[in-house]
Amino acid sequence: MGRREEMIAKIKELMLQPERIRNIGIAAHIDHGKTTLSDNLLAGAGMISEELAGKQLVLDFDEQEQARGITINAANVSMVHNYEGKDYLINLIDTPGHVDFGGDVTRAMRAIDGVIIVVDAVEGVMPQTETVVRQALREYVKPVLFINKVDRLIRELKLTPQQMMERFSKIIMDVNRLIQRYAPEEYKKKWMVRVEDGSVAFGSAYYNWALSVPFMQRTGVKFNEIIDLTLKGDNKTLRQRAPLHVVVLDMVVRHLPSPIEAQKYRIPHLWQGDINSKIGQAMLNCDPKGKMVMVITKIIIDKHAGEVATGRVWSGTVRSGQEVYLINSKRKGRIQQVGIYMGPERINMEAVPAGNIVAVTGLRDAMAGETVAEEQIEPFEALHYVSEPVVTVAIEAKNVKDLPRLIEALRQLAKEDPTLHVKIDEETGQHLLSGMGELHLEVKLYKLQKDWGIEVDVSEPIVVYRESITKPSPIVEGKSPNKHNRFYVVVEPMPDEIYQAIKEGIIPEGRVKDPKAVAKKLAELGMDYDIARGVVDIYNGNMFLDNTKGIQYLNEVMDLLIDGFHQAMDEGPLAKEPVMKVIVRLVDAQVHEDNVHRGPAQIYPAIRTAIHCAMMKAGPVLYEPYQKVIINIPYEYMGAVSREISQRRGQLIDMRQEGEVMTIIAEAPVAEMFGFAGAIRSATSGRALWSTEHAGFKRVPNELAQQIIRQIRQRKGLDPNPPTEKDVCPLF
């Protein structure tokens, strides 16, 4: 039996023993060394050759990732590790650290139970570290810590062992502070990472060594010995004395939970169904004999197999030929092939039981986040994405005959990545592609041209603004065109605390299933409980409440009213941009008794006009997306970089100096950040390292707002003059 066959046989055997499985991820700030760590873990476990590991980046198997040197898609591999005489199956998902790809991180967190947080010993805890830790803890994923690039502290910064220990302590404190802040109440203490119990390891992924207290106690290897070997440059002995994969995977097996353990506390939080039902119990207990339930976390388009859906099996067993329900998209499907990953390679299996990460083909309409089950059940709660699309490009096929293929390609791209929004502009016939940032869109467009061979013309990037209001409106009446239905609404600005709670998933978006529970949360955040009890729907950071009493037939049109509310929120009155932070309260209504007189053609315009007119009376304003920029540069470029930022309406938030290196943290409007990469490279002769992340929305200064509204309206083929209250409010 060859090495590969042996490996597959071992994986097949361990798949059936969930207590021996660990589903883990690696998450970190960009360039802190995640992918190098993943590769060296694979090499140690015998999945790739050691010489190549760290240089070859197995998990970065997309050509673009190799070229850019960053991880774009969360890849998935399975490997075997022996700990205290027993074999364990470790399923590892590598996630991107670049902010534009935050969606991949969110999806990967759903599939795993534990995560290795990687922090660069030189840079310490960075903003993106905080984002990934928050995402992990929100999905009830337990963390351990690996402090990477320790070789740089020894070689470049020439720190003494004492100084290094101080630096480690600070990183551990910072990570524990994040765990304290974001972990679920009952795990704030339990999940803190500690050097003494081995839930912290430190080392160098690139040079393939690591240490932890349990390892040092067991083997007698001392830190001073490692320092000497590093200074001598004896990397071979380093690897042999303190092998990275042994230290890190021991930490994983010892401190991160098996599916059996994790599902007991994760399922009640991720799934809203009845825990005491048969299927609820099967998931709690990770029972391979129960009914099958899996959640898809990623769709990959494979040249040979078509769409491959990767996901986590919570209960039952996935088999080829199985008839299943796609719960969210309300349709049936049939699973064709079933397999698991070994590196980028997919290996077919007859069946994959609960507790494993599976790859299936045949589910043609599945999206990331879809719940797939053998019978109709409550879906898992929606995945929370940390930031929303803020940049749009318009694309057209250069060749008209490519149009049908372009539409199909865009559909596929949007399926692979739900944080990408695709829309056809009805008026201009252009396809609008919105993403998290410039890089996100660049990567997707490259994929479009390379994988599909479609030549496209791409517009300059356009920023997606938001419309909102500054004060409560008076009561506004909206009439249906036939005058038989009337709706009376009030709009109010949404308090920041409530908006944050929605964005962080504490108050879930969508139709409200349990108004009392949501009202209780809203009341805790300062809303009047009696008003909050009317909450019906939460949509893109806006809220619709029914505060009427005993209106006849209102229930019959409630679905239409909610659709109309969505339409009003998708395109605000100022420039048809999405609306944010608005509370719409229905306070009174008259609804015609006859079904015929209260269809969509009557209800939509009535509620839409009422909401837009109320917004015009509530001090309408424009918000623009901001980015946080973190730049590391040699001290002498300080002035050039500050100038570059202030020219872009940016402001400096913080500056730190460590040795020769300055870290600048600034915020600037996304609209001013296009072309920043090139500008900063030339300003610093290519010596700047920088990353960005979404920093929310801020109000556009008044003097700029009118000009921007004109530009947007002109681009959309509307009358460029900003509308007045008279234009929006009908004369009744």
Swiss-Prot record:
It comes from the Archaea. GO terms for cellular component: cytosol; ribonucleoprotein complex. CDD domains: aeEF2_snRNP_like_IV, EF2, EF2_II, EF2_snRNP_III, Elongation_Factor_C. PROSITE patterns: G_TR_1, G_TR_2. Keywords: Cytoplasm, Elongation factor, GTP-binding, Nucleotide-binding, Protein biosynthesis. GO terms for molecular function: GTP binding; GTPase activity; translation elongation factor activity. The modification Diphthamide is found at residue 597. SUPFAM superfamilies: EF-G C-terminal domain-like (SSF54980), P-loop containing nucleoside triphosphate hydrolases (SSF52540), Ribosomal protein S5 domain 2-like (SSF54211), Translation proteins (SSF50447). The keyword Transcription regulation does not apply. It is found in: Cytoplasm. Residues 19-260 form the tr-type G domain. Catalyzes the GTP-dependent ribosomal translocation step during translation elongation. During this step, the ribosome changes from the pre-translocational (PRE) to the post-translocational (POST) state as the newly formed A-site-bound peptidyl-tRNA and P-site-bound deacylated tRNA move to the P and E sites, respectively. Catalyzes the coordinated movement of the two tRNA molecules, the mRNA and conformational changes in the ribosome. Belongs to the TRAFAC class translation factor GTPase superfamily. Classic translation factor GTPase family. EF-G/EF-2 subfamily. This is Elongation factor 2. The gene is fusA.
